[in-house]
């Protein structure tokens, strides 16, 4: 096949482009692989992450307080004194817990004056810059809104001020100025700071002691040239000051040198020349550099630490702030410092001349003793002239080793403390170096070449992503603890964590001088804690190396994006997102990320019908009705743009076409109430209704109600008296006569309940002489006559009782009767009639009548069991109107009826409703449902996700009292009288309580008014503008004076410089223990009763 020329040229160019791009990508991959290989072979020191260090660290914070820059250790009292912005704290050395907090803020007038001079509100605060524990006192100085002030306070109670003095020349005005101070064993304060508002007059100043106040020469840049003071130490006969300043002896450009300066502590100043000025001031350069043909100097001193046991001064040095970041630690012997000060001076004859070496007139200078004749009798004019012009040493102070102890590129060191550790074979100097990024480097200082510059670990005391320099760093050797001051907190970090290494390999691999493997106990411990020194193993021969193997981690998910998916013949759209295994990437054999890297959701889905439901019951029981069946488009439901189902979701058909309805059956109206069954004592009324056109009407045809509940009165009835009947007639005509009557009483309206009372008999005597008025005399005469004619008189006698009659009722207590006649014999010839009752009555059939069961009325239809998708109504009745007695017939028929409801389809996206929950105390029930859509569309999940309803009466919870159920019965007798008594009692008690509260408030107010006479209480003393004399007016205003060699600051105790606007208030907070009693329900007084309803 022949290819035309232009086409061949185009294909050739395309091939070359692909080849070049392939080669370029191959080179990039090879370069990346090579750099990663170099990273895996690089040796780095171990790093202790913030989360790993956190369990070992104690921290202290205080709301609204910042700049924890001054830390002072007080081991004898087991406390740490902390100076921050506007506050002083006493903390426990064990766990930095708060012992005391004292506010030390500037007054409102002082701050307002500061801001009027152009300073910001942030600058116009009281920043503590001097904090020294001296015996039983704490000496402290603060900037006090550019009006420095100092005070001495009790070391055990910071709120108690012993003495307050001027802070000028002892503390800087500006909190950003570096300063340092030390108190000697004689109680003299040596301060190195700037002593004017603008910060242009630096000085090393002595005060407060028995000697005269002295300072460096004022406005003489050869003595101090824009210095930054770093540290001050009281060593022997000298006071040493470490600083960095612009080098006056450097001829080309501006260069910063690090210096050490010293003065004799018994210096008394000059006479006529150098009056009130140091006569023993000297300074020398500190050399910290990498040796070589062209040395690399670390010129700027940042921190210094004195190790008195070894007569060593350790210093942290960095490069210039505008150059490449690099840091080093160098150590200097005090003998090397003395050697430099005993060497030649460097002197400049005039400003145009060079700085040249000049011999030391006193090569072995020592601070002499003060003669008895006077403090400056031995100072000659020549010696004062030499002291004025010869102060800069020609030779620099050389470090202990030619190379720095530790160096680090790309990092700036800021603080340093040193600990001496006795290992198994030698004594190690362990350096703890603070960095400007907020980490602490733990390093070894040793003469061994294999361990030179050896970093043991790097401690991350700040959480990831937070970078800030350390404000202060202190070490407590006895407790083996570091105390770190940050902008918002104080930390206590242990010097060693030997128990964190759980294996021998990890313990020995840490190369930590504190730690070794205890072979007897098989654990990592310190030398002091080892059980047997001979079995305690250490291996500090090389530096520890961090394991650079790193497992991969997923990065964040990308935003959701639309994507396509294929499912057989169907296709649709989805939302997709992805993440990469790059946070971090697996490195140096680390594991790949575990888990999905792609997430797919909300894929579109076409809807499909479910199967038809079964036909519902016919809508009518007779006559033409209809039946319904349904289906829903939820198998599956359409989602995220999928097609909806095509067709009907509901079908209907006729039913009962051939079942005509019978004549309507209905209840007729109720009839009138019947007469009450009893006139009293409780009866029953009834009324009836009839079921028209049938006998199957729902409900009851009879209703009953009680009537005439009042008790029946007892009715008594007496029978008439019988005629008088003679008894015991004598032959002489004397006799006794009797008559009878009976009493009946009926306590019930039922006549069968009548009871016969006692028979009552009356007797009278009729004498024979006729003196008595007896109506039966003729009858007696007849009897006598008949007796005389017929002597056989026959009295009547009862026949036997007849049988008992049948019971008057079949049940519920009837009665029966039996009778007898007076025929055995009948009374004749004037015989007496039978005495006694002719009839007897007896109770019978006391058992209850049998009861046949009958249905109660139907309850109302219940609520529908579902709001959609098909539910049911329900109603019930019970066989309790009346309930059947044992052995009798039960009710026939159904006790429950149900009907369909809510047959419409449910809204798309919702799950089924949950069951109704339990009733709350408010008498409500609730249920819920959830949306099953991940990203619901506009038509999905419409409606509420929860429903509530009033509880059925039978389910409303009743809150019972705490006492037992039996106790509640005692409240059943609660009536209106009890309610009135309770109300009156509550009113009286509330009145007494109100009176007591009012009297208590009046008493507290009087106490508060009395206390304000001594300590005025104001809402905010910084803004208090009361009408009386302010508290700050008790202090004498300060008259500002220019400080020069002829006008020095005398001792403040002579009151030469009264303080200006020292309106500094202190407020003390003591943390109180939490002794609040816990709430106990059983201690709640009273008892709640619920009367029976």
Swiss-Prot record:
Glycans are attached at residues 59, 95, 157, 178, 287, 333, 378, 532, 539, 547, 602, 728, 944. GO terms for molecular function: semaphorin receptor binding. Its main location: membrane. Pfam families: PSI, Sema, TSP1_2, TSP_1. One of its GO terms (cellular component) is membrane. Residues 551-605, 606-662, 664-713, 721-776, 795-850, 852-907, 908-952 form the TSP type-1 domain. In adult, only detected in brain. It comes from the Eukaryota. Residues 1-19 form the signal peptide. Disulfide bonds join 114-124, 141-150, 264-367, 288-330, 618-655, 622-661, 633-645, 676-707, 680-712, 691-697, 807-844, 811-849, 822-834, 864-901, 868-906, 879-891. It is a single-pass type I membrane protein. Keywords: Developmental protein, Differentiation, Disulfide bond, Glycoprotein, Membrane, Neurogenesis, Repeat, Signal, Transmembrane, Transmembrane helix. Coiled coil: none annotated. Gene3D superfamilies: ligand-binding face of the semaphorins, domain 2, Thrombospondin type-1 (TSP1) repeat, YVTN repeat-like/Quinoprotein amine dehydrogenase. Residues 45-495 form the Sema domain. Residues 20-978 are extracellular. One of its GO terms (biological process) is neuron projection extension. It is found in: Membrane. May act as a positive axonal guidance cue. PANTHER family: SEMAPHORIN, SEMAPHORIN-5B. This is Semaphorin-5B. It comes from Mus musculus (Mouse). The lineage of its organism: Eukaryota, Metazoa, Chordata, Craniata, Vertebrata. The gene is Sema5b.
